[in-house]
Amino acid sequence: MNKQEFYVLIERDEDGIYIGEVPQLKACYSQGETIDELMQNIREVIELCLEEIELESTSEFIGIQKVVV
């Protein structure tokens, strides 16, 4: 199986838990008490997400922009 590359957006909530989201895969989220734990968990979630969808339905991650209002 070919390796695929995904980006993970990481935030920390008010309780100090790290939350990760994969923008290329809809509804692909996980969390962990450390970034290492989050990354291990998100790998498992990505594998599950890929089993549920066809590769053509993934979107291409373009980037992140900051907006000041």
Curated annotation (Swiss-Prot):
One Pfam family hit: HicB_lk_antitox
GO BP annotations, alphabetical order: regulation of DNA-templated transcription
Protein name as catalogued: UPF0150 protein ssr1258
InterPro entries (alphabetical): HicB-like, TA_system_antitoxin, TTHA1013/TTHA0281-like
Source species of the chain: Synechocystis sp. (strain ATCC 27184 / PCC 6803 / Kazusa)
Sequence similarity: Belongs to the UPF0150 family.
